[in-house]
Amino acid sequence: MLFLLKSRKEGKEKVSIYSVYCFFLRKENGKDE
């Protein structure tokens, strides 16, 4: 949570959300396999 708030201050909110999104995608893909 903290890294998201920190990134928001730095104007990298989109990058943080994208990273978390990719992380969940990998997790979901891992479940299928």
From Swiss-Prot:
Q: Lineage of the source organism?
A: Eukaryota, Fungi, Dikarya, Ascomycota, Saccharomycotina
On the tree of life, the source organism's domain of life is: Eukaryota
Other remarks on record?
Partially overlaps YPS1.
Name by which UniProt lists this protein: Putative uncharacterized protein YLR120W-A
